[in-house]
């Protein structure tokens, strides 16, 4: 005999109802996972127990993206079919949608901070762990990239400073060479000026013996400036002195 169909009705026994809920929920999540893998579909399941406990399942993409996609499509369809008189109703629905989204984001934020984890299933905890691992990978990758860029920038600055120092050192050496050459040239000029000049060549002149014996001699002029006597005047004086005895002798002869 074939197995009879099970009548669908509410289970009155609380324990049996809880056990059945756990089994059917696990089977539902399993079927959702199978259809997502086999058919490459994005699946999101949200289940609340009779006590108000939340159970959810989503594919590799997070629940928020799937819900945002659902809201976007459903809102666009409602905008197409809604008459203009239902503007207030649409605003109310938009408010409810945004409010639910805010609550979901706040709950996920608490989960990311390690809070309110008691109501999460092992599968949900595993998904949360994967999301945190992915976020940590992105954070570490970005941090390593920033550190690598910082090291490259410091190396570039160090190379520029070394090149600048080398250029300055080269300029200093060239300047020192120029100063040394100028100093040597200056020393040579000073040495040439301090050397005594050679005496002028002597000219051999034939002079009269009398003139050789009567060379002008310097004399001391007390209380005045020294003035050199004119050579022509000195010569005339010498001639007068030499002729005076002869002149006196002649005068004596005439007197006799």
Curated annotation (Swiss-Prot):
This protein's record includes keyword Ion transport: no
Q: Give compartment(s).
A: Nucleus
User: A single GO molecular function, which one?
Assistant: protein dimerization activity
Q: Which GO annotations describe the biological process of this protein?
A: cell differentiation; flower development; positive regulation of transcription by RNA polymerase II
Q: Which residues are in the MADS-box domain?
A: 1-61
- Where in this chain does the record put each K-box domain? 88-178
Query: One GO CC annotation, please?
Result: nucleus
The UniProt subunit note reads as follows: Homodimer capable of binding to CArG-box sequences.
Q: What is the protein's name according to its record?
A: Floral homeotic protein APETALA 1 C
Give the organism, scientific name. Brassica oleracea var. botrytis
């Amino acid at each position: 005999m074939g197995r009879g169909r099970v009548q669908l009705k509410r289970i009155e026994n609380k324990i049996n109802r809880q056990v059945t809920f756990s089994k059917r929920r696990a089977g539902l999540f399993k079927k959702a996972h199978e259809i997502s893998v086999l058919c490459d579909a994005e699946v999101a399941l949200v289940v609340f127990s009779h006590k108000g406990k939340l159970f959810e399942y989503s594919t590799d993409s997070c629940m928020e993206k799937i819900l945002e996609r659902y809201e976007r499509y459903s809102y666009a369809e409602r905008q197409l079919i809604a008459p203009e008189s239902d503007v207030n109703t649409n605003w109310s629905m938009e408010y409810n949608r945004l409010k639910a989204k805010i609550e979901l984001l706040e709950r996920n934020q608490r989960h990311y901070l390690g809070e309110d984890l008691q109501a999460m299933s092992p599968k949900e905890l595993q998904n949360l762990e994967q999301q945190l691992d992915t976020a940590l990978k992105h954070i570490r990758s970005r941090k390593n990239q920033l550190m690598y860029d910082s090291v490259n920038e410091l190396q570039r600055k160090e190379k520029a400073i070394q090149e600048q120092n080398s250029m300055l050192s080269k300029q200093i050496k060239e300047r020192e060479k120029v100063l040394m050459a100028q100093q040597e040239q200056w020393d040579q000029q000073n040495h040439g000026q301090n050397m005594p000049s050679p005496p002028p060549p002597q000219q051999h002149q034939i002079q009269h013996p009398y003139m050789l014996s009567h060379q002008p001699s310097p004399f001391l002029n007390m209380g005045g400036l020294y003035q050199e006597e004119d050579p022509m005047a000195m010569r005339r004086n010498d001639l007068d002195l030499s002729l005076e005895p002869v002149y006196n002798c002649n005068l004596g002869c005439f007197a006799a």
